Amino acid sequence: MRGILVALTAALIFCSLTPAQPVLHIQETNRAKNRANRKLVARQPEYKAVETLEKNVNIAIAVGTALVTLVSAGVGGMLLSDHLACKSVAKQEEIMQKSWDSMHPDGFTPAGDQMRPVSFDCSTQERGLKPLQSYTNGAEMY
């Protein structure tokens, strides 16, 4: 994914440096006819983009859109994986609570190091998006 991001950024940078292709279908006779009038008309560049896909603006828009899509997909993936992890922890805690209740139908109150598993609510435990914070210490957030 990092390679794609670097390639798209390089394409965005180089699209402004790449010269357009020359227009080859203009005949020399037309240029000879209009040489006298050329001084009166505003100068036009010698090279023009042949198709819309060759224009630098369109290339920049396409590469920029691809970059935004790539970053959005990455952020969406981070949020989805965090949400699925939270749901998995909540499900595991629910299974542990059911196991505790089935083992202690008499309402046993734990003492010492025995504890009934805690209830886990994703709406209060799930953290928001903090892309600048390291995601390597996720266990400390729960």
From Swiss-Prot:
Q: Which residues form the signal peptide?
A: 1-20
UniProt GO cellular component terms: membrane
How does the record say this protein sits in the membrane?
Single-pass membrane protein
Free-text disruption phenotype from the record: Decreases virulence in Zea mays.
GO biological process, alphabetically ordered: biological process involved in interaction with host
- This protein's UniProt keywords: Membrane, Signal, Transmembrane, Transmembrane helix, Virulence
Membrane-spanning residues: 59-79
Q: What is its subcellular localisation?
A: Membrane
- Chief subcellular location: membrane
* Quaternary structure, from the entry: Monomer.
Known role: During infection, may play a role in establishing and maintaining biotrophy; the formation of a tight interaction zone between the host and the pathogen.
Q: What is this protein called?
A: Virulence-associated membrane protein 1
Species for this entry: Mycosarcoma maydis (Corn smut fungus)
Could you tell me the gene encoding this protein? Answer: VMP1
